[in-house]
Amino acid sequence: MSKVYDWFEERLEIQAIADDITSKYVPPHVNIFYCLGGITLTCFLVQVATGFAMTFYYRPTVTEAFSSVQYIMTEANFGWLIRSVHRWSASMMVLMMILHVFRVYLTGGFKKPRELTWVTGVVLAVLTASFGVTGYSLPWDQIGYWAVKIVTGVPEAIPVIGSPLVELLRGSASVGQSTLTRFYSLHTFVLPLLTAVFMLMHFLMIRKQGISGPL
């Protein structure tokens, strides 16, 4: 086993990387409230895992979406548990994100030189809200349908570009299969990819600049 480790160590300098990760200075003022961002990340990872599991059974069509969710809840092995954990962790992710934003704001963590860290955090907050909007529609029940209809109708009030923007969101003049397909694509591919990219940027900047000091 040591020979295998030595082989990788010689080429990748694993020990140096491990030392850099584990020896990072943590300021003495850091408390449990500084863990809220990490909890938000944990919730996101749970979302990815449980969401991926449900894609094996979910069918993104207006005729089969609701029945496929019912199948997950009643027939698929541990499907009810996976979907429930997905919903609970979604609520927890939103709550932890809000508390994290408040903590950063109240402790002045957005000030120079951490402005870009704050900007990426705001983008992540918007992406998190977008997860909620797109995911809410996927069961395609009465609540999901009317929620999508209302949300996608909001841009209608914008002058000039309102109507084209509504049609872009819905995929057609009215809410239907095109809308569900777009929301499913956003929820399972576009938003997770963007979130992963901005999280990486967020953490790299925190790693580079360190945790902000006390007020």
Swiss-Prot record:
Subcellular location as annotated: Plastid, Chloroplast thylakoid membrane
GO molecular function: electron transporter, transferring electrons within cytochrome b6/f complex of photosystem II activity; metal ion binding; oxidoreductase activity
Keyword field: Chloroplast, Electron transport, Heme, Iron, Membrane, Metal-binding, Photosynthesis, Plastid, Thylakoid, Transmembrane, Transmembrane helix, Transport
Residues annotated as transmembrane: 32-52, 90-110, 116-136, 186-206
PROSITE patterns: CYTB_NTER
Binding site for heme b 1: 100, 202
Co-factor remark: Binds 2 heme b groups non-covalently with two histidine residues as axial ligands. Binds one heme group covalently by a single cysteine link with no axial amino acid ligand. This heme was named heme ci.
The keyword Hydrolase belongs to this UniProt entry's keyword annotation: no
Bilayer topology: Multi-pass membrane protein
Binding-site residues, heme b 2: 86, 187
Cofactor(s) recorded in Swiss-Prot or TrEMBL: heme b; heme c
Keyword Electron transport (UniProt): yes
GO biological process, one term: photosynthesis
UniProt binding sites for heme c: 35
Gene Ontology cellular component annotations, sorted alphabetically: chloroplast thylakoid membrane; membrane
Matches recorded under CDD domains: Cytochrome_b_N (cd00284)
Alphabetized HAMAP family for the sequence: Cytb6_f_cytb6 (MF_00633)
Family: Belongs to the cytochrome b family. PetB subfamily.
Note: Heme 1 (or BH or b566) is high-potential and absorbs at about 566 nm, and heme 2 (or BL or b562) is low-potential and absorbs at about 562 nm.
UniProt function note: Component of the cytochrome b6-f complex, which mediates electron transfer between photosystem II (PSII) and photosystem I (PSI), cyclic electron flow around PSI, and state transitions.
Self-association state and partner proteins as the record states: The 4 large subunits of the cytochrome b6-f complex are cytochrome b6, subunit IV (17 kDa polypeptide, PetD), cytochrome f and the Rieske protein, while the 4 small subunits are PetG, PetL, PetM and PetN. The complex functions as a dimer.
Designated name of the protein: Cytochrome b6
Organism: Zea mays (Maize)
Gene that produces this protein: petB
